[in-house]
């Protein structure tokens, strides 16, 4: 069965693993998921991510995210929300990029220059599709 929204599936797996205090979570790999994982790592929301080659008998690559917690198991991700969906795409101009929780969170934007955070897109003056909010 095909997946309608692979990005929403990734964010749901991340949210569920975070709520259950899991150390890692795995999902099918794609370039855009790896790009989102790279942004989450650079912004300090996850500890690491790794692309695993398919094992014998498996079909495709997998992406493994290593979650990050504080000293007393405080979650580094308070919330994740998918914004642009297959049924309702959400775009923002460079002048109208969203601020998540007054700048405490990030918005992940798909632009012509690749995946960027809202701050990076504002600095480069590019708009694009608002994929998700993370705070």
UniProtKB/Swiss-Prot annotation:
HAMAP family (UniProt xref): Ribosomal_uS8_B
Gene Ontology molecular-function annotations: rRNA binding; structural constituent of ribosome
InterPro entries the record matches: Ribosomal_uS8 (IPR000630), Ribosomal_uS8_CS (IPR047863), Ribosomal_uS8_sf (IPR035987)
PANTHER family associated with the record: 40S RIBOSOMAL PROTEIN S15A
Protein name, entry field: Small ribosomal subunit protein uS8
Gene giving rise to this polypeptide: rpsH
Keywords carried by this UniProt record: Ribonucleoprotein, Ribosomal protein, RNA-binding, rRNA-binding
Gene3D superfamilies, A to Z: 3.30.1370.30, 3.30.1490.10
Pfam families: Ribosomal_S8
One of the record's GO cellular component terms: ribonucleoprotein complex
Subunit description: Part of the 30S ribosomal subunit. Contacts proteins S5 and S12.
Main function: One of the primary rRNA binding proteins, it binds directly to 16S rRNA central domain where it helps coordinate assembly of the platform of the 30S subunit.
Family that this chain belongs to: Belongs to the universal ribosomal protein uS8 family.
Source superkingdom: Bacteria
Higher taxonomy: Bacteria, Bacillati, Actinomycetota, Actinomycetes, Propionibacteriales
GO biological process, alphabetically ordered: translation
């Amino acid at each position: 069965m095909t997946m309608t929204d692979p990005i929403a599936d990734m964010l749901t797996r991340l949210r569920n693993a975070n709520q259950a205090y899991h150390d890692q979570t795995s999902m099918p790999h794609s370039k855009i998921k790896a790009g989102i994982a790279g942004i989450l790592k650079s912004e300090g929301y996850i500890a690491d991510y790794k692309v695993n080659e398919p094992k014998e008998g498996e079909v495709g690559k997998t992406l493994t995210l290593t979650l990050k917690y504080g000293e007393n198991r405080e979650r580094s991700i308070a919330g994740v929300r998918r914004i642009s969906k297959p049924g309702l795409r959400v775009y923002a101009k460079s002048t109208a990029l969203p601020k998540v929780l007054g700048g405490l969170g990030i918005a992940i934007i798909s632009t012509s220059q690749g995946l960027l955070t809202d701050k990076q897109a504002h600095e480069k003056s590019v708009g694009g599709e608002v994929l998700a909010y993370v705070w």
